[in-house]
């Protein structure tokens, strides 16, 4: 049930909608926006496994960036890969950016040379971001999700990433990276 005063949909990044296009959440294309007071039930098979995310697809600038209408969507595999079985801590970092001057202007957004007001991790800008607290010996899975309009460079001082998944899919050969460049909609584990 849409209990807000604005229309909404949910669009799924990475979730396959084979034979189920009407649940993809693109207003005016796969469904009509859900008006205030109306309801819509999304039906889908949670496949493939991996790191995905969802967001409102109506006035994306305002609803995603300013109102935070997005989140991670994780589908666990039936049979984890050997590398996944070594993980002791799992962190999700949704990287976003926004500029208040574009918030209420559907179809507008960052233009070349534009400087955004805020850069966020899980919807929080520094100094309100949360630290990743770990213990010596922990094996971390860090799920990076590009939920903004810009490319975000991610680097953890004193450590190297082992990139094993891209856009929810296992890579044939994981690789080491000092810095990961996460673009809009991309996911890295």
Write out the residue ranges for each language-model feature.
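Copper-binding active sites and cupredoxin-like electron-transfer domains
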Residues: 1-189
